[in-house]
Swiss-Prot record:
<keyword id="KW-0722">Serine protease inhibitor</keyword>
<keyword id="KW-1015">Disulfide bond</keyword>
<comment type="function">
    <text>Serine protease inhibitor. Inhibits trypsin, elastase, plasmin and kallikrein.</text>
</comment>
<dbReference type="InterPro" id="IPR036880">
    <property type="entry name" value="Kunitz_BPTI_sf"/>
</dbReference>
<dbReference type="GO" id="GO:0004867">
    <property type="term" value="F:serine-type endopeptidase inhibitor activity"/>
</dbReference>
<feature type="site" description="Reactive bond">
    <location>
        <begin position="17"/>
        <end position="18"/>
    </location>
</feature>
<protein>
    <recommendedName>
        <fullName>Kunitz-type serine protease inhibitor RsTIQ7</fullName>
    </recommendedName>
</protein>
<feature type="domain" description="BPTI/Kunitz inhibitor">
    <location>
        <begin position="6"/>
        <end position="26"/>
    </location>
</feature>
<keyword id="KW-0646">Protease inhibitor</keyword>
Amino acid sequence: EDFDSQCVPTADPGPCKAYIPMWWYNVLS
């Protein structure tokens, strides 16, 4: 998946800025 490549678990405001919180939510659940 390109998800990890484009939406890294950092505070970097990348192209997936809106997906960052969702990514963390998924990891923490």
